[in-house]
């Protein structure tokens, strides 16, 4: 079974996204993608949701 992790980022810069991706990949999660939430009044995203996956741990 696949387990999903969603990390919310309210600061959407390349440095912030790189930090989040590197942090969670180092913890054993596989990067799966990014979804951006846009503001109507701006071309820059208001926030980002960084998606990760990994195989479920047997309990």
What are the roles of these predicted feature ranges?
Residues 1-59:
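Terminus-proximal functional modules
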């Amino acid at each position: 079974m696949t387990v999903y992790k969603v990390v919310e980022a309210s600061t959407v810069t390349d440095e912030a996204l790189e930090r989040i991706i590197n942090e969670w990949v180092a913890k054993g999660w596989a990067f799966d993608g990014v979804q951006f939430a846009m503001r109507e009044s701006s071309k820059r995203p208001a926030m980002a949701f960084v998606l990760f996956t990994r195989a479920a741990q047997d309990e």
